[in-house]
Amino acid sequence: MHQQHTLERAMRRALQLAGNGPAEGVNPRVGCVILSPAGEIIAEGWHRGAGTCHAEVDALARLDPADARGATAVVTLEPCNHTGRTGPCALALIDAGIGRVVYAVADPGPHSSGGGDRLRAAGIDVAGGLLADEVAAFLADWLVSARLGRPFVTVKWASSLDGRAAAADGTSQWITGPAARRDVHERRARADAILVGTGTALADDPSLTARAAD
């Protein structure tokens, strides 16, 4: 059994790997590392977007099958129990002979959840909740969509100290500085859609793109 600090270090590495995946799209960003019985990282993987292999399968593909038997998979999200464009990760871990699975956040999806129970039924030791707060913060956008069945919405509002959004004569182009504009475009790049009101569309004809700050 691995010590707590070994598992936490592995989970933070898995979270770092998850950040390599695309921020937009319906699938969550997930990372996975596989530990040897000695606690060494012997394989890593992450999800690269809808239709590609999930993090657990990506990690297993980089590992000699003999080394997978009895190893520990540390993954940021509970392995899925769903067949879509790819097969269920829980089954892939079972077939590979993984001995233990440690995950951070339970999968709330109505179709993809239940992977932990499937793993336990196959005799695999399963533990959830490791660094759950850190991973949940990283997955906040996706978790809202998965739990509530609606998009995660970010409202952008810029105003001056006296509560104004533009000059009264309409001559102002921006009231924010370069740092704020850069932040907005970084957020746009991570979003699936950009919306504005009718007034803004008519007055500014905005391009609604993600680009470098002007």
Task: Pin down the residues of each PLM region.
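Residue-level signal for inorganic ion chemistry
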Residues: 14, 31, 80, 119, ...
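Zn2+-dependent cytidine deaminase-like catalytic core
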Residues: 33-134
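Proteins enriched for Cys/Gly/acidic motifs involved in redox and nucleic-acid/cofactor modification
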Residues: 23-24, 52, 116, 130-160, ...
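Short loop/turn microsegments at loop-to-beta-strand junctions
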Residues: 28-31, 42, 153-155
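Structural motif corresponding to alpha-helix initiation and N-cap regions
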Residues: 86-87, 132, 136-140, 177-181
